[in-house]
């Protein structure tokens, strides 16, 4: 299954705010509120929607998400918490959380086009798993600097998470992310339950 490229507001309308997918918000009207109350959701649908939230927010394919579930299952500790840590420590998500891009999709494009330097090497793999003490900088090109500065100015009110430290154009990953501090309301246990028969 390929990555979703369709209308994003349609997804936000169905699943709620997804900051990694789009900056647009759902307009709350009285009719929307009534529709939300009317719908009775099955247990399967509740779990499916939680899984879809995660998939669309991080911009993953079904196969990629299943692979992360399998890795999380093998690790020690809570599968759901480990899954969120794996996804939060991806390079494209880290760029997004630093405010260098408006969405995770835009952050992925920055990485793919070689605008990001990780530990003094250009990295063009968005799924690269960042580790504590990794240093992220902007590539020493005018185009890269202008593009990222424009994004950071637009997102100047953004609060940088506790596991990241930012000084001018250099960011440092200080520790592994705490799953409670992710920028998305999601019930990871429902996602693990959804995949319990597949993975």
From Swiss-Prot:
One of its GO terms (cellular component) is chloroplast. It comes from Zygnema circumcarinatum (Green alga). The lineage of its organism: Eukaryota, Viridiplantae, Streptophyta, Zygnematophyceae, Zygnematophycidae. The gene is rps4. Part of the 30S ribosomal subunit. Contacts protein S5. The interaction surface between S4 and S5 is involved in control of translational fidelity. One of the primary rRNA binding proteins, it binds directly to 16S rRNA where it nucleates assembly of the body of the 30S subunit. InterPro entries: Ribosomal_uS4, Ribosomal_uS4_bac-type, Ribosomal_uS4_CS, Ribosomal_uS4_N, S4_RNA-bd, S4_RNA-bd_sf. Residues 89-151 form the S4 RNA-binding domain. SMART domains: Ribosomal_S4 (SM01390), S4 (SM00363). It is found in: Plastid, Chloroplast. PROSITE patterns: RIBOSOMAL_S4, S4. Belongs to the universal ribosomal protein uS4 family. It comes from the Eukaryota. This is Small ribosomal subunit protein uS4c.
């Amino acid at each position: 299954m390929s990555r979703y490229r369709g209308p994003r507001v349609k997804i936000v309308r169905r699943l709620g705010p997804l900051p990694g997918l789009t900056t647009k918000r759902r307009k709350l009207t009285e009719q929307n509120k009534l529709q939300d109350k009317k719908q009775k959701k099955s247990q399967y649908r509740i779990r499916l929607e939680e899984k879809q939230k995660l998939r669309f927010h991080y911009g993953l394919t079904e196969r990629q998400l299943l692979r992360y579930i399998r890795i999380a299952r093998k690790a020690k500790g809570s599968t759901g918490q480990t899954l969120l840590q794996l996804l939060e420590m991806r390079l494209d998500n880290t760029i997004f959380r630093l405010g260098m891009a408006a969405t995770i999709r835009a952050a992925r494009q920055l990485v793919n086009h070689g605008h990001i330097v990780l530990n003094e090497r250009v990295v063009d793999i968005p799924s690269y798993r960042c580790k504590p003490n990794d240093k992220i900088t902007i590539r020493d090109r005018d185009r890269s600097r202008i593009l990222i500065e424009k994004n950071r100015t637009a997102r100047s009110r953004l609060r940088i998470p506790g596991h990241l430290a930012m000084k001018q154009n250099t960011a440092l990953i200080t520790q592994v992310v705490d799953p409670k501090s992710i920028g998305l309301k999601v019930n990871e246990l429902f996602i693990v339950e959804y995949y319990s028969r597949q993975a």
